[in-house]
Amino acid sequence: METFLFTSESVNEGHPDKLCDQISDAVLDACLEQDPDSKVACETCTKTNMVMVFGEITTKATVDYEKIVRDTCRSIGFISDDVGLDADKCKVLVNIEQQSPDIAQGVHGHFTKRPEDIGAGDQGHMFGYATDETPELMPLSHVLATKIGAKLTEVRKNGTCRWLRPDGKTQVTVEYYNDNGAMVPVRVHTVLISTQHDETVTNEEIARDLKEHVIKPIIPEKYLDDKTIFHLNPSGRFVIGGPDGDAGLTGRKIIIDTYGGWGAHGGGAFSGKDPTKVDRSGAYIVRQSAKSVVANGMARRALVQVSYAIGVPEPFSVFVDTYGTGLIPDKEILKIVKESFDFRPGMMTINLDLKRGGNGRFLKTAAYGHFGRDDPDFTWEVVKPLKWDKPQA
């Protein structure tokens, strides 16, 4: 059996880039909660002792940007300079302006267009991906890297590993077998964790705790063997972290947000963007499309692409590739996808209920992945029944 290795990485919520994603989405939630028609393009950057939110927002909502920044930093665990940022003492800069009137007239006609006539907020192409290798219909390498990162945060916050600090990165290499286009995981080849820690803990304690409290609960035993390699804090020291260690910026973790390097990516980030931005809503609808193709048994693996022009409601193109795993030809699956999903931005917003903010809805997406999550707020994860005729054996 010929196999190959594939690697996916993740970062947890205390990573500076992810901190910025979460602040941008917390701002989006606050705007949509009060005004579902808010037009939001919110960016965040951070470095030592400073967070800045900037961008274009048109909303009727009354939003305390500084409070959102401090609350988000605090909830992640940035409560002192020792851990990389102090939520209560850091400088918060705000530079928010209104959406460009040129964009507004072209996209939503200054709020006068009907939903079916709302144009895409920008040009671009987005990809959705699904694979039958996990119950989530997501790549195993990505799922494991992401869940290990989430577990790191869990054992930090519940006090199991008191030496942990907010920043951290994970990486998992999986050995795969290609079964006529479908991906079959064989074993976990390598696990890498680099996590921020306090001054008191030894490298031996770090390795022991990570294996016992983080890796064992997440990676199924069937994927681990005596050849699995563990790199646990290989640099030897990771005390300085968060914005104190590295600058952070919204939208720099787009592969972690999606499929861990599998499928494809059009390059657009998600966080801080309202649903007229097809970077986000377009990526959500094609995830639902690809997932539905696989969940309905039409293929074991699927990639769906959609593309747009600014101000134009109808997509320029829709593309489907099942990597040779389809039970019917890809052109027939494409026809079913186009008949079953409405790719116009205004209609995607309605069908996926993307104007509903509040309750940390979009904030939840900004750490540990936008896809493969079992949460009713992730409406794009709902499988749509597709009508098709299964070929007779």
Swiss-Prot record:
Keywords annotated in UniProt: ATP-binding, Cobalt, Cytoplasm, Magnesium, Metal-binding, Nucleotide-binding, One-carbon metabolism, Potassium, Transferase
GO biological process, one term: one-carbon metabolic process
Any GO MF annotation of the entry: ATP binding
Gene3D superfamilies per record: 3.30.300.10
Entry-linked Pfam families: S-AdoMet_synt_C, S-AdoMet_synt_M, S-AdoMet_synt_N
InterPro entries per record: ADOMET_SYNTHASE_CS, S-AdoMet_synt_C, S-AdoMet_synt_central, S-AdoMet_synt_N, S-AdoMet_synthetase, S-AdoMet_synthetase_sfam
Reactions catalysed, as given in the entry: L-methionine + ATP + H2O = S-adenosyl-L-methionine + phosphate + diphosphate
EC code(s) of this entry: 2.5.1.6
Pathway the protein takes part in: Amino-acid biosynthesis; S-adenosyl-L-methionine biosynthesis; S-adenosyl-L-methionine from L-methionine: step 1/1
Binding site for Mg(2+): 9
Description of how the protein assembles with itself and partners: Homotetramer.
Purpose of the protein: Catalyzes the formation of S-adenosylmethionine from methionine and ATP. The reaction comprises two steps that are both catalyzed by the same enzyme: formation of S-adenosylmethionine (AdoMet) and triphosphate, and subsequent hydrolysis of the triphosphate.
NCBIfam families: metK (TIGR01034)
Cited PANTHER family: S-ADENOSYLMETHIONINE SYNTHETASE
Family: Belongs to the AdoMet synthase family.
Name of the molecule in the record: S-adenosylmethionine synthase 1
